[in-house]
Amino acid sequence: MSAANEPIASPAATLRELFDVLLLDLDGTVYQGKNPIEGAVDALRLGSEKQYFVTNNASRSPSDVAEHLVDLGFDTSEKFVVTSAQVAARMLAERIPAGSAVVVVGTDALAQEVALVGLKPVRSADEGAVAVVQGHSAETGWSILAEATLAIRGGALWVAANTDATLPTERGLAPGNGAMVSAVRAATGQEPLVAGKPAAPIMDDAIRSSGARRPLVVGDRLDTDIAGANATAIASLLVLTGVSSAVDVLRADHSERPHHIGFDLDIL
């Protein structure tokens, strides 16, 4: 992958011409809350490369994500969306028998992904659960965390959609799925398998889905987007429209340093 992803330098080429697929983060990269980032729609329309939207957010279905993007003016569909919920469900299906019960800590969209791969989503450890999948939901409370804990302590496989400590909102950073994962970790002494960025599975699935030979990861967070790209030997672009700043880049460990940096998507 790393050899195939080394673009041939060309002084006449724009950045995007060196790559065949853009793997784009969502919040902070192409939109902020309910609004597209200024210039993002036009910047993406200018390209001829394939554009896939890759998100750690497991709370919405690919169709809901695509609908939101289309409503904001982006030209896409659900086939170009890769979510950590899809990846987590795939990881479960590869490790436990078809029809197995899985405690779902998360939204109905996450439960739907579990069902789509031939597993049985449940909300109680007492329903014969052999696995737990954990993704963000604003409704997550003690009761479902207790069910997850009981299942894991009983030997259930544990897959987390992501371990993002915070979640961007229009009012600022709020607790993310990683904060809830930490609670279950503390109660079980176990570590989950992780589907989303910066772990490799979501990047691997995005590359497989897109058929990319020279992908470029585009995102606003050093600790997820850029670290995930570096972990899988993929070129990366940090845009300064979200969480991480230019100062953060200067302070970052080598594992979180982007190959390219730009104020916004116009850099493409």
Model-predicted segments: where are they?
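Conserved phosphoryl-transfer catalytic core
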Residues: 49
